[in-house]
Amino acid sequence: MKSIKNTWKLFALDWKRIFKNPVATFLIVALMIIPSLYAWFNIKALWDPYANTSQLPIAVYSADKPASFQDKTINIGDEVLKNLKKNHQLGWKFVDSKAELDKGVKSGKYYAGIYLPKDFSKDLLSFTTGDIKKPQIVYSINEKINAIAPKITSKGASSLQSQISEEFINTASSTLLKTFNTIGYDIDKNMVSIQKVKSAILSTNDNLGTIDKYTQQVVDLHGKMPEIKEKLAKANEFITYLPEVDSLGQKVISLNDKMPEIDKSLSLVLTLQEKIPEIQNAGKQISMIDEDFASVESTMTQGIQEAKDGLQIINQVQKSMPDIQKLGQDADSLGTVTLDAAKKMQSALPSITNSVQITLQSIQEFSKNTSSVLAVIDQAIADNQLTDEEKEQINSLITNFINNIARQREAIQNIVDYMKQVQESNGSHDLDSTIEQLSNLDSLLSGLSTRMNHLNELVQNGDVSEIRAYLSQINDVVTKISNLVDNIDVSGISKTIDTVLTSLTKTIADAKGLLNQAQQIDFEALLNSTSQTVSNAVTILEKYQGEMPAIKQEIHDANLMLNGNMTTIVNAINEGASLYKNEFPILKTKLGTASDFFKNDYAGVRKDLTDTLTMANEKMPDVESALNQANSLIQNDWPEIKSGIQKAATAIQKGEKEVDLGEIVKLLKLDATKESDFWTQPVEVQENQVYPIANNGSASTPFYTALCLWVGAVLLSSLATTEVHLSDKDKKRYSKREQFFARMGSFVAIGLAQALIVTLGNYFGLGVDVRDPFYSVLFALLISIAFMIMVYVLVALFGNVGKGIAIIILVLSISGGGGNYPIQVSGKFFQAINPYLPFTHAVNLLRESAGGIYWPNAWFAIIILVAVSIIFVAIGAILFPHFEDKTKKISEIGSKSHFFH
């Protein structure tokens, strides 16, 4: 642990000394960057050299003379020049003479020259005469100008040769095949009739069995002609029924048009089915009413009589009022008479209570009738329109309704006036809440009357949407009226009035207050309001009593009809619902289909039927005549014809076995263009780029990156010393091995910086195409560590000799590392040393990250580099303490020459 700690102290000491010295800092930064410049300049220079081959001048001159072929003048040289002018792969320079071409190539003005001799076209067409002579392209190249240029220009000449060869093969093969086409089409044209006859004979022979069946059917049909004529006559009779069918079709269409209305009406049976329990309950209620109707009549008669008795008492009191007023001066008489009137009023209280109850019940019934009126209006606007007749009916209904509201309000006002008079007579306020309820009820009825008037205006204007909205508002008012009537306590009102009258009687009986009280009571007003209230109740009851016999008979009839037929009604509703659910949809579908047929297809079918029968009637004589002739042919001539067909078919089949003219014609008629194209280029190359790299510069990056890392290590070892400068005291404190590892750490740190700078500069600065940038940086760091350790150990152990060894390894790596060219094209020596050079594996590792990593190869290179690093570290750690003094002595001997430092 102490050794490691000392090593870190020495490592830190190195960097403190560097950063304290500006010159040293500058040199270290320069050493980190300068090796990268070496790589970047080379990569950029080689970025895409083949993209600029159009700037490579190549002289072209054609001395070719035109040649004749089949009365056509052909000049291949001119065609070549035209094509080259369209070709921008090389810098073609079209000169005016052979001498200018040769001079330009010799002087280096042009890298190469291409010359087409004067007999080029003639020699190319020599195959047509049989005296074949291959044409020549004269290619001149100046190889001293550049090492790569001859290869590029040679490729251009080869491409030109291939192009001319392809054009020649294409033209020759196309001409030959077009001639074959002409021959093939001529044969085909002359064989059309033969093929048709041959096919007809063979087909007929193959189907003789079928033809025999048809001939027999013709004979049978001929025998059935009388029966066919009879059926045709019956079909003609059917035409006379078409008008009836037309009428039936119109009825079907009309019925189908009304189907939505029918469907809507029939759907009510489902509602009835849901209401069966209510219908059965209604039957029970009607039966109970029918049985108890006599009691109802008796109760109503009794109520009317009680009301009349009360009214009679009130009338008696009213008749006594003049006498009471005359006796107003006599206190005793006044008290007696007034007390008597009050008692009579109290005795009439049951009649008054019944009157109030009847009035409220009438209003409650009226609110229920309101819902019926609104339902009638809602039903009328169900189809979103109102007829004039419907408007008139609704107007009459609403007018009667508004008049009824007025009567109800009058009755309520009489009750309110009566209650106010009763309270004023006693000076109490016990009936205030009831009076307020009745006043609110009157206000609601007034609002309802106003709304019904406005509703009538909307109905007359025919605005259906506003009518619907307004009906909802009216329903809300009716609900409020019904709720308010339900909340009025009639029995409580009766008790309150009784209490008030009792109090009044007691007060009048008191002699002390008799005179004063009697004078304050307005019996006349009280009696008038009471009389009016009771009279209204009597009128309502007598109206209902007059209708009782008819109502009784209607209830009795309804009871007999409903309860006597309840089972039948329920069964009928259920059966109707089942029919609507199950049978009616089928009927509706079938009726719709029939309606569609009569609307869309019937006219065409009718026309086809009549036209067909008309045509059949017209053609029947011709058909009969043709059948007679066919029957005669079959009976007399068909056996001989059949025998001739069989003989001809046998002869044709025999000839087809020996010669297949169809295949010959097919070969001669092949597409000349496609076939000549195939002969010109029978094979196509499909290129598959396994690890694509965008350009030449990116492909060269692994080589120059590895090279710059080795150069950086050598450059650092040349400028920096491997010896740690320490005082004599510190030399005793730190061992040589600790000094060795500390300085190696400093070298490696600088090497890592060099690796980061060059790889990041490649990617972000130059835009090098790298498939795996992260691994590219990681691999470069590993390579830098390995190279820096190797160079450091060599220099630390051997001094300047070690530097020389590092340079020798560098030279061998450039030639034997397989960086720019495949190692297989190098000499045997370089192929032999290639696997043992660390540079080889460094380049291979960087190539993996550039094009795409194949991990078996990558791991192999990583293992080699790690192993080399470990070996050199081990060698240095073992030998450095023993070699340092010897290395110093060798360096001192060299420095005595005053030439080496």
Swiss-Prot record:
Q: Which cysteines are joined by disulfide bonds?
A: none
Q: Is the Transmembrane helix keyword given for this protein?
A: yes
Instruction: Name where it mostly resides.
Output: membrane
One Gene Ontology cellular component term attached to this UniProt record is: plasma membrane
Question: InterPro entries, per this entry?
Answer: ABC2_TM, Phage_infect_YhgE_C, Phage_infect_YhgE_N, T7SS_ABC-Transporter
Mind telling me which residue stretches traverse the membrane in this protein?
Answer: 23-43, 701-721, 747-767, 778-798, 805-825, 860-880
| ABC transmembrane type-2 domain span | 701-880
Q: Specify the superkingdom.
A: Bacteria
The record gives the membrane topology as: Multi-pass membrane protein
PANTHER family from the UniProt entry? TRANSPORT PERMEASE PROTEIN, TRANSPORT PERMEASE YVFS-RELATED
Q: What does this protein do?
A: Required for phage infection.
Q: What is this protein called?
A: Phage infection protein
- What is the protein's species of origin? Lactococcus lactis subsp. lactis (Streptococcus lactis)
Organism phylogeny: Bacteria, Bacillati, Bacillota, Bacilli, Lactobacillales
